[in-house]
UniProtKB/Swiss-Prot annotation:
Record-listed DNA binding positions: 91, 110
Quaternary state and interactors: Monomer.
Record's protein name: Formamidopyrimidine-DNA glycosylase
Domain of life: Bacteria
Source species of the chain: Streptococcus mutans serotype c (strain ATCC 700610 / UA159)
Gene3D superfamilies, A to Z: 1.10.8.50, MutM-like, N-terminal
GO BP terms: base-excision repair
Cofactor: Zn(2+)
Length: 273
């Protein structure tokens, strides 16, 4: 699944490719993907121009003249831009014909991606309603509210970091990486963490996600950015996908377990409770 760094990389690619382009045709082949109604979606966006491309957590914000398309890539979603003819592909589901003759295509092997069309004035309330936490950067992600949120929780730390309420954008890959870097067992109860451990998790979340953005995300399975290029963060991963390989800190073999139903990579030595 694309996590925050991958979605940010897609955002930057789309910003370069489609901002200023006018939508001259719309085709939706899988209506269920458009959660706010496919007929209104197709009618309302026709003739509007992509003014800017934003992001909130793992959500893309395709800002038009009057409205915003909120796009969630889910497991396998990606965008492709074709300058001329669009090839046949059963996994191409949404088509935005643009002035100048190019076509922006949404591809999704599993059809889990979603689109919602909202007035711009309702976008902020949308994310408040979903309880999406702050962006994982030094400006927005403050230590004190993070400490307070952990203290109130009855969840283990990995599950809590995945739920997006205390900090936005973390998924399975980067939670494993953050907890390894912070030397915290993924099965520790969040409310029992020491202040020093919480600060390490906080600081490593910011550091690792910013590094991943710089590297263009991790290419794991099917992820590519909106230019069709692989990211390179996978070359910097220390624990995710490294079952039975030696820990980079202590050489203990990395183990993979299930935490809250999610495959979880950790070092049983330097992340022990």
């Amino acid at each position: 699944m694309p996590e925050l760094p991958e979605v940010e990389t897609v955002r930057r690619g789309l910003e370069h490719l489609i901002v200023g382009k006018k939508i001259v045709s719309v085709e939706v082949r899988v209506p269920k993907m458009v959660k706010t109604g496919v007929e209104d979606f197709q009618l309302d966006i026709l003739g509007q121009t992509f003014e800017s491309i934003g992001r909130r957590g793992k959500y893309l914000l395709l800002n038009l003249n009057r409205q915003t398309i909120i796009s969630h890539l889910r497991m396998e979603g990606k965008y492709l831009l074709f300058e001329d003819e669009v090839p046949d592909n059963k996994h191409f589901h949404l088509f935005f014909g643009l002035d100048g003759g190019s076509t922006l295509v949404y591809q999704d092997v599993r059809k889990f991606g979603t689109f919602e069309l909202l007035p711009k004035s309702q976008v902020e309330a949308y994310f408040v309603q979903k309880k999406i936490g702050p962006e994982p950067n030094a400006k927005d992600f403050k230590l004190k509210p993070f400490e307070e949120g952990l203290a109130k929780s009855h969840k283990v730390i990995k599950t809590l970091l995945l739920d997006q309420h205390l900090v936005a954008g973390l998924g399975n890959i980067y939670v494993d990486e953050v907890l390894w870097a912070a030397k915290v067992d993924p099965e520790r109860l969040a409310s029992q963490l020491k202040k020093s451990e919480i600060k390490r998790i906080h600081d490593e979340t910011i550091r690792i996600l910013q590094l991943a953005i710089e590297k263009g995300g991790s290419t794991i399975r099917s992820y590519k950015n909106s230019l069709g290029e692989d990211g390179s963060m996978q070359d910097c991963l220390q624990v995710y996908g490294k079952t039975d390989q030696p820990c980079a800190r202590c050489a203990t073999p990395i183990e993979k377990i299930k935490v809250g139903g999610r495959g979880t990579h950790f070092c049983p030595s330097c992340q022990k409770q």
